[in-house]
Amino acid sequence: MSEKSVEAAAELSAKDLKEKKDKVEEKAGRKERKKEVVEEEENGAEEEEEETAEDGEDDDEGDEEDEEEEEEEDEGPVRKRTAEEEDEADPKRQKTENGASA
């Protein structure tokens, strides 16, 4: 019986070692991917800073102007859609306003 116990213990330890090795490799792979993502984010941030520096504008001023332009763009189509949606969504109301019964 002692031989079987020794063999079983050796098999378990080999399995355990393999599992641990796999886990270590997985962790190393995750760390490498995270490192790559961080590097990409840092590189992207550096490129943005370079672009704004080339424009000669402060970040604050440019952002405010961009926000104003976006708001103006958003307001136009939203108002049109709202009026169209009201006309389509409430046909009974149109009929009563036009003199027809609902």
UniProtKB/Swiss-Prot annotation:
Annotated region described as Disordered, given as residue ranges: 1-102
GO biological process: immune system process; negative regulation of apoptotic process; positive regulation of transcription by RNA polymerase II
Positions with biased composition (Acidic residues): 38-75
Taxonomy of the source species: Eukaryota, Metazoa, Chordata, Craniata, Vertebrata
Family as reported in the entry's similarity comment: Belongs to the pro/parathymosin family.
InterPro entries: Pro/parathymosin
Taxonomic source organism: Rattus norvegicus
Residues the record lists as N6-acetyllysine modifications: 4, 15, 92
MF (Gene Ontology): enzyme inhibitor activity; histone binding; zinc ion binding
Cellular component GO terms held in the UniProt record: nucleus
N-acetylserine modified-residue sites: 2
Name of the molecule in the record: Parathymosin
Feature: compositional bias, Basic and acidic residues: 13-37
A Pfam match: Prothymosin
Phosphoserine modification, residue list: 2, 5, 13
